[in-house]
């Protein structure tokens, strides 16, 4: 543990905690500070000027990162008939209906994203108590409740991520791996930032993006300036 502690302290010394870095410089610092033996995930935390307690200031959605996250997403699709065939053809890892519902009720969770056709939501809704807390419940706002399962699966496999403001007004999301070229991380961050700017609630007052911090899984936070 001491060795890990020293690595972290060395990484901390690279970062001026009182400085707000330009995005490119910030990304380079995060990559340099990622010294773990595994390929660390690069994450971003947005502190937004919204009041999540108000219904008109909820922020939730999804965006396809141009270079993906570096993680292969296992997709489960609830669909029947032709839509089930479409999902399989699109590359869904698991496709089913009542059989998959029973499997999940039995404690199976070997998937990362769930898509459902609207006609299946009556049955899928029974899984709300187990899928909801894990952030896996399909939702129209994130494009995971749809009859266009081909598009949904393709987007997820291409690097689509979901975002949702928490109770404190923060949004946390992965934007790639430390092994990514810096320009790819910069472009992924830009895509997410643009999506959040588009999602700004009309009722939000004052500064919208109050604080944006990048970090790797084991590294220190680096504040950056985004537009």
Swiss-Prot record:
It comes from Brevibacillus brevis (strain 47 / JCM 6285 / NBRC 100599). PROSITE patterns: RIBOSOMAL_L1. Part of the 50S ribosomal subunit. This is Large ribosomal subunit protein uL1. The gene is rplA. It comes from the Bacteria. Keywords: Repressor, Ribonucleoprotein, Ribosomal protein, RNA-binding, rRNA-binding, Translation regulation, tRNA-binding. Binds directly to 23S rRNA. The L1 stalk is quite mobile in the ribosome, and is involved in E site tRNA release. It holds the Pfam family Ribosomal_L1. The lineage of its organism: Bacteria, Bacillati, Bacillota, Bacilli, Bacillales. Gene3D superfamilies: 3.30.190.20, 3.40.50.790. InterPro entries: Ribosom_uL1_bac-type (IPR005878), Ribosomal_uL1 (IPR002143), Ribosomal_uL1-like (IPR023674), Ribosomal_uL1/biogenesis (IPR028364), Ribosomal_uL1_3-a/b-sand (IPR016095), Ribosomal_uL1_CS (IPR023673). GO terms for molecular function: rRNA binding; structural constituent of ribosome; tRNA binding. One of its GO terms (biological process) is translation.
């Amino acid at each position: 543990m001491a060795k890990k502690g020293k690595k972290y302290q060395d990484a901390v010394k690279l970062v001026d905690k009182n400085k707000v870095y330009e995005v490119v410089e910030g990304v380079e610092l995060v990559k340099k500070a990622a010294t773990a033996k595994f390929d660390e995930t690069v994450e971003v935390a947005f502190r937004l000027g919204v009041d999540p307690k108000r219904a008109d200031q909820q922020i939730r959605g999804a965006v396809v990162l141009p270079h993906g996250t570096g993680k292969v997403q296992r997709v489960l699709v609830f669909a029947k008939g032709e839509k089930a065939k479409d999902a399989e053809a699109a590359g869904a890892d698991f496709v089913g209906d009542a059989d998959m519902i029973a499997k999940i009720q039995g404690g199976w969770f070997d998937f990362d994203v769930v898509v459902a056709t609207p006609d299946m939501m009556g049955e899928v809704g029974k899984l709300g108590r187990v899928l909801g807390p894990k952030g896996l419940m399909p939702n129209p706002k994130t494009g995971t409740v749809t009859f266009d399962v081909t598009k949904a699966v393709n987007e997820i496999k291409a690097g689509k991520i979901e975002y949702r403001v928490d109770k404190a007004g923060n949004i946390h999301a992965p934007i790639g791996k430390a092994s990514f070229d810096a320009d790819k991380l910069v472009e992924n961050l830009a895509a997410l930032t643009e999506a959040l700017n588009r999602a700004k609630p009309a009722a939000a007052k004052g500064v919208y993006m109050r604080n944006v911090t990048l970090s790797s899984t084991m590294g220190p936070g680096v504040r950056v300036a985004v537009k």
